[in-house]
Amino acid sequence: MEQLEYVPNSIARGLSSGKHWILGLVFMRTGADGSVLGVEEASLLYTDIVIRGAETRAAQRGYSLLLSSADDLHPSNLASLMNLTGTVDGLVLLDRILGDDGVAYLSKRIPVVLLAGSGASSSAVTVRVDNEQAMRSLAEHLADAHGVTRFGFVKGSDESPDSVARARAFRETVTRIGGSLADVDVLEADWTSAGGESAMLGRLARSEPLPQAFACANDQTAVGVIYALNARGLNVPDDVLVTGFDDITLTRYFNPSLTTIRQSGGMLGAVAVDVLIAMLDQSDVTPPSVVLPTELVLRASCGCSEGGEAARAPLMAKVPST
């Protein structure tokens, strides 16, 4: 066939096998104001990494990947996804596109993999990272290596199982090690740098002593938090320690370089595709949910050197100047 330069016809292949040879990946739509600039401002770099990993693995396995976006838990999402069932062989849902009832309904009609979900659904297989161990290792490092006793946390979306799991595990660990995580120091953001900046500016406006360290639900949020602190004359890490989650490429070149939790977004997307194809190949067997490991990466924003040598956190809580 190579000598004849034969190229398989995907339509004919689908007719002969009863399959479309197309997988769908649906991710959360960003840019709430609906403008092009709003979409650019709210774009999530980590989502792009996950999509690229899924797309590469799908191609390796002989499938095309159809991308679609949806609003977070919007009532119309189920109807939109049902329309895709005649086009794709299976669906990967990134984060909270559907509630539990919607997932149960959809999964009766087409194989579904929840990517970065809570892992609690009995209706679909979940592929996620070990958020709990990640946040335990981070909180313990801040306390043990830097002497932090006053902690803050900057959340992502309240509807995101990842954000909820990270906040809960961080709180539980801080409580266990005897630290203080007051409610006023849990800030609401939306995964974006702009959201992190806005959350921190709001916190600084209260003119109350700051925690010694803020852990952020993702790297982009941490970048916005650091920007806001710098804008008010506070230095990271001399005045406040800041950490992220994801280890996107930007964090290595940011100043200060960002201490973060490394998770492989590309691997997350690839494994989700592998699990979905396994469900298609063996429709009578449901694969187990998958939890991928993470790694604590120590850099300058928490007071560590690149090699991990730690400096102590500031003992005196900073009061932002007005």
Which residue stretches match the model-derived regions?
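Short helix-capping segments at alpha-helix termini
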Residues: 60-61, 174-182, 206-209, 231-236
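Alpha-helical recognition/docking segments in bacterial nutrient-uptake
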Residues: 22-140, 204-205, 209
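N-terminal helix-turn-helix DNA-binding module of bacterial transcription factors
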Residues: 1-22, 306, 312-322
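Glycine-rich phosphate/diphosphate-binding loops that line cofactor/substrate pockets in enzymes
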Residues: 141-151
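Hinge/beta->alpha junction and helix N-cap segments in small-molecule ligand-binding domains
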Residues: 32, 40-48, 67-75, 127-137, ...
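Structural signal for hydrophobic
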Residues: 23, 112, 170, 239-240, ...
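Flexible loop/turn connectors
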Residues: 201-322
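Periplasmic-binding protein-like
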Residues: 25, 87-94, 150-154, 186, ...
